[in-house]
């Protein structure tokens, strides 16, 4: 059974347009509270990023949870992985994040974590959706008796607790003293956390894009827009730069030369560091979008590699199925189950810094030990029609077959719909950059006219 409201990363959309409305958020809070907090502490944590709409949706969710008899603990602007961690340590029944991650401020979303700090599975989301449908279609939101309504409280030391957790994933015998690091918080949820983590571990920190005003989150900054970080690293002659996205669940690096180090390269650096110390447990989980160069580099160390569906939730599922600990996506979602239950940009960055210090090499040198294959990704925005019907059209299928014949065994093609936006993503990868670009554009055009 397919999910109606939950995409690959919760519920997401444009603020003021269904389903990202106050009414929907209230009913979702009621349905989720009824399902997730039917036993246990009957309390949920709510965190958010810095979007102006977060206040509105937070209040609506509070009302829904209270109507279901569930208490709410507010932790304010907080990275998504912090909510996952704190939901577990506070013994809450669930954690709620109000964020649209790397999207612009006019989008927002709602996602849930279990009391173990993991994202909900498909069955749990379907159960919530079934109850939500009743509340939407039949106005069946049943408020508990007045004496059983949920209460709301604010937790003031949440940021400090999370900072200490992050620092605890970094070895005590190492220090960042002597490193100059530029940190780009994307005017997002980590603006008051990430710079302090690195400073408290000894680094000289230049903090940029750390002044959220409700509408500047991810605005030409952060992990999806690295130009300002690249410039800052060069201007300040820093050792490296670290970019987070709006909710700090993904991370990208810039080396001292101003060159980007993406999620695939981060996975390689972490896997190689573990391999060289004899600490590599199992293999690495990537996704269908992971660069073939990563797979080949890992193969050179006899490290197994498997591809999950795109989305960090599916990477986690594959990690648990295999019993492995390291996985992630090229976009910077890095999963290290040894340290955290979900993708954590700050924690992942600390593991990269550990690898840099222990190797005695610069980040650029570690990056250079993996050769990426040219990969072209074209996002085709849909103005009409649904992604599934377009992908099933013969003209699109024939374009893919033709491209695969041209590439032969020196490349691969992948088409997939976005789980969060009206897009079809066309990815082509091969050893020849001009051929890769040509075939990607050919397929993208077929999708546009389909």
Swiss-Prot record:
Residue numbers of Phosphoserine PTMs: 101
Positions bound to Mg(2+): 101, 245, 247, 249
Could you mention a single GO BP entry for this protein?
Answer: UDP-N-acetylglucosamine biosynthetic process
Q: Name one GO cellular component term.
A: cytosol
- One matching Pfam family: PGM_PMM_IV
Q: Where are the membrane-spanning stretches?
A: none
Q: Which GO terms describe its molecular function?
A: magnesium ion binding; phosphoglucosamine mutase activity; phosphomannomutase activity
Show the Gene3D superfamilies listed in the entry.
Alpha-D-Glucose-1,6-Bisphosphate, subunit A, domain 3, Alpha-D-phosphohexomutase, C-terminal domain
Keyword terms, alphabetized? Isomerase, Magnesium, Metal-binding, Phosphoprotein
The cross-references to InterPro entries, in alphabetical order and at most eight, read: A-D-PHexomutase_a/b/a-I, A-D-PHexomutase_a/b/a-I/II/III, A-D-PHexomutase_a/b/a-II, A-D-PHexomutase_a/b/a-III, A-D-PHexomutase_C, A-D-PHexomutase_C_sf, A-D-PHexomutase_CS, Alpha-D-phosphohexomutase_SF
Quote the cofactor binding remark.
Binds 1 Mg(2+) ion per subunit.
Give the protein's cofactors: Mg(2+)
Q: How is it modified after translation?
A: Activated by phosphorylation.
Q: Which PROSITE patterns match?
A: PGM_PMM
Reactions catalysed, semicolon-separated, are: alpha-D-glucosamine 1-phosphate = D-glucosamine 6-phosphate
The similarity comment for this entry is: Belongs to the phosphohexose mutase family.
Q: What HAMAP family does UniProt report for this protein, alphabetically?
A: GlmM_B
Q: Which PANTHER family match?
A: PHOSPHOGLUCOMUTASE (ALPHA-D-GLUCOSE-1,6-BISPHOSPHATE-DEPENDENT) (PTHR42946:SF1), PHOSPHOHEXOSE MUTASE (PTHR42946)
This chain's function reads:
Catalyzes the conversion of glucosamine-6-phosphate to glucosamine-1-phosphate.
**NCBIfam families (UniProt xref):** glmM, PRK10887.1
UniProt protein name: Phosphoglucosamine mutase 2
Give the species this sequence originates from. Shewanella sp. (strain MR-4)
């Amino acid at each position: 059974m397919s999910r109606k409201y939950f995409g690959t990363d919760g519920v997401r959309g444009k603020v003021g347009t269904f389903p990202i409305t106050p009414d929907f958020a209230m009913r979702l809070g009621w349905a989720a509270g009824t399902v997730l907090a039917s036993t246990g502490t009957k309390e949920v944590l709510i965190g958010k990023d810095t979007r102006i709409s977060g206040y509105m949706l937070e209040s609506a969710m509070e009302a829904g949870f209270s109507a279901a008899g569930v208490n709410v603990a507010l932790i304010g602007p907080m990275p998504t992985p912090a909510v996952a961690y704190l939901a577990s340590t506070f013994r809450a029944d669930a954690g709620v994040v109000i964020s649209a991650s790397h999207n612009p401020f006019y989008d927002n979303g709602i996602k849930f974590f279990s009391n173990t700090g993991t994202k909900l599975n498909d069955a749990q989301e379907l159960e919530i959706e079934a109850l939500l449908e009743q509340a939407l279609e039949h106005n069946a939101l049943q408020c508990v008796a007045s004496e059983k309504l949920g209460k709301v409280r604010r937790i003031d030391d949440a940021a400090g607790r999370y900072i200490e957790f992050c620092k605890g994933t970094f070895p005590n015998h190492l220090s960042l003293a002597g490193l100059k690091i530029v940190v780009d918080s994307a005017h997002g949820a980590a603006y008051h956390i990430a710079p302090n983590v690195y400073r408290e571990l000894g680094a000289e920190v230049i903090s940029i894009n750390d002044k959220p005003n409700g509408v500047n989150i991810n605005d030409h900054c952060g992990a999806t827009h690295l130009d300002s970080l690249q410039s800052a690293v060069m201007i300040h002659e820093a050792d490296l730069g670290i970019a987070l996205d709006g909710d700090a669940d993904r991370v990208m690096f810039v080396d001292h030369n101003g060159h980007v180090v993406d999620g695939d390269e981060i996975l390689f650096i972490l896997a190689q560091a573990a391999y060289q110390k004899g600490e590599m447990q199992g293999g690495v989980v990537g996704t269908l979008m992971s660069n073939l160069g990563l797979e080949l580099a890992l193969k050179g160390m006899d490290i197994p590699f498997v591809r999950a569906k795109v989305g960090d939730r599916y990477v986690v599922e594959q990690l648990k199925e295999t019993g492995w600990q390291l996985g992630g996506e090229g976009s910077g979602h890095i999963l290290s189950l040894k340290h955290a239950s979900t993708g954590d940009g700050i924690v992942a960055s600390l593991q990269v810094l550990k690898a840099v210090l222990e190797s005695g090499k610069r980040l650029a040198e570690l990056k250079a030990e993996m050769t990426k294959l040219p990969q072209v990704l074209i996002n085709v925005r849909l103005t009409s029609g649904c992604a599934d019907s377009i992908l099933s059209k013969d003209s699109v299928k024939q374009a893919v077959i033709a491209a695969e014949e041209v590439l032969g065994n020196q490349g691969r093609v992948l088409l997939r719909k976005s789980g969060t936006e009206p897009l079809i993503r066309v990815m082509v990868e091969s050893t020849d950059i001009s051929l890769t670009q040509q075939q990607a554009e050919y397929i993208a055009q077929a999708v546009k006219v389909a």
